[in-house]
């Protein structure tokens, strides 16, 4: 299939709050979840990116600032300082 069908985020229904909470924990295991973080459309795009780029996995973010922040925060701790060039994406410096 070239394009998987689009799955609307509002169609993900949980029987209990506990079931919804468990789905949120298991997002890395392709468990259906509400929003951009766990629909079949989302998982198909991740799989395509892994195949195209030859990667081991793929994380999707709603914007560039979120992606940059996650990359930086995975290496620094509270109180750390980082050096960056003046030409970096402006919101990152803030």
Short names for language-model regions:
Residues 1-23:
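N-terminal amphipathic/basic leader segments beginning at the initiator methionine
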Residues 5-6, 57-59, 80-81:
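Structural motif
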Residues 51-52, 70-78:
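Alpha-helix C-terminal capping segments
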Residues 74-92:
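Conserved PLP-anchoring active-site segment centered on the Schiff-base-forming lysine
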Residues 10-11, 63-64, 85-87:
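Fold-independent oxyanion-binding glycine-rich loops
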Residues 16-66, 91-93:
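Conserved N-terminal alpha-helix of the aminotransferase class I/II PLP-enzyme fold
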């Amino acid at each position: 299939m070239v394009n998987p069908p689009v799955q609307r985020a509002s169609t993900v229904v949980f029987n209990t709050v506990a079931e919804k909470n468990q789905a949120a924990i298991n997002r890395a295991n392709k468990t259906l979840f509400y929003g951009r973080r766990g629909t079949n459309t989302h998982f198909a795009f991740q799989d395509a990116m892994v195949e195209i780029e030859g990667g081991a996995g793929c994380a999707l973010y709603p914007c560039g600032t979120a992606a940059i922040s996650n990359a930086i925060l995975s290496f620094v701790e509270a109180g750390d300082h980082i050096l960056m060039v003046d030409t970096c994406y402006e919101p990152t410096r803030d």
